[in-house]
Design a protein with these regions (language model features):
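N-terminal nicking endonuclease/strand-transfer module with a His-rich metal-binding environment
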Residues: 1-237, 241
Length: 246
């Protein structure tokens, strides 16, 4: 990326109640956005790489439950059911490379990356916003400049084996796999398994001698960076990689 450019992928945790506010913003269901610099006349230019087919986010979630594709077994009432991943790049990066069309290609690939993490069916909505004006850059360049970014709302699931208990009457079945479910679980989905390394490439350990693992979102940033760089959608011109922040 050019000097001063940065990219970011951050993940927020959302409950069934909390996701409704995000839905209204992402899907432009509000009548006005006084503090968001949203130009509703440009909202038709927003790009959905995945939509709900007319359902609300919670209705889509319930549909997957009803179809037996996900499970909320054992979750508390106010549990995290959704993730919102926001992928963002500073405004000038796209403006210098063709603006809207370049951003659309960039974020389509970011969406494909997210499909690899969550599974496409578990992604409820993925929309690139093209209607939020960047007032500072607009003033600097003397023309309307819009800030392109991607909102992805997804369901974090992990594959879980349910085994027959020791109380099963059939001794041959005890301890064997009864069924495999896609369990909704933010904590398990984002449990880090990548060791932290020191400057010498050695595994970092805590005071008890246990391995210290990298923060999962840091790993996410690196993987997204590598994915987009391999497709030549991120260009490195300086000797160090772009600043990836969470």
């Amino acid at each position: 990326m050019a000097e001063g450019s940065w990219s970011v992928a951050r993940v927020a945790k959302l409950t069934a109640a909390g996701v409704q506010k995000n839905e209204r913003h992402n899907e432009r269901k509000n009548e006005s956005y006084a503090n968001m610099n949203v130009d509703l006349e440009r909202s038709p230019l927003n790009v959905h790489f995945k939509d709900t087919g007319g359902l609300t986010y919670n209705e889509y979630f319930q549909k997957l439950i009803d179809e037996g594709k996900i499970s909320t077994r054992g979750l508390r009432e106010n549990a995290t059911l959704f993730n919102e991943m926001i992928v963002d790049v500073n405004t000038k990066y796209f403006e210098e490379r063709g603006g809207y069309e370049y951003a659309r290609t960039f974020y389509e690939e970011a969406y494909r990356f997210a499909c690899g993490i969550y599974g496409e069916e578990n992604i409820i909505s993925a929309v690139m916003h093209a209607d939020e004006i960047n007032k500072a850059v607009t003033e600097e360049l003397g023309k309307p400049v819009y800030h392109y970014h991607l909102h992805i709302v997804a369901i974090p699931t992990v594959r879980k084996e349910i085994r027959w208990s020791k109380r099963c009457k059939d001794e041959a079945l005890r301890g064997t796999v009864k069924e495999v479910i896609n369990q909704v679980s933010h904590s398990k989905k984002w449990e880090s398994k990548v060791p932290e390394l020191d400057e010498n490439g050695q595994v970092v350990r805590n005071e008890k001698g246990k391995t210290v693992f990298r923060k999962s979102y840091s790993v996410l940033q690196d993987k997204l960076f590598e994915h987009l760089t391999a497709l030549s959608l991120i260009h490195i011109s300086e000797p160090t990689r772009p600043r990836l922040i969470s």
